[in-house]
């Protein structure tokens, strides 16, 4: 969910003086628990103990789950492409905000006319 926020809502906005205006959660929308799918199940690999002294003997996960969020962006981009019956390869920049998605849809509509 953190990665989905990174690719859809966490937009960097700079003012005319070059100052970052979206410096933290108070200035942009971050994902909330309500953004989690209602059926979100995780299965861990069975019989793979970790001998390291970590919390609950967990294994490090690092960035891979974060990067799996590209599937959210890909699904949005495919949805935009469907507007033109997949005849156009739409440009959808990240973060894929609602405004950028709408602009991409408009661009696809213009190109398939």
Q: What feature does the model see in each segment?
A:
Residues 1-113:
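C-terminal catalytic domains of large/alpha subunits in multi-subunit enzymes
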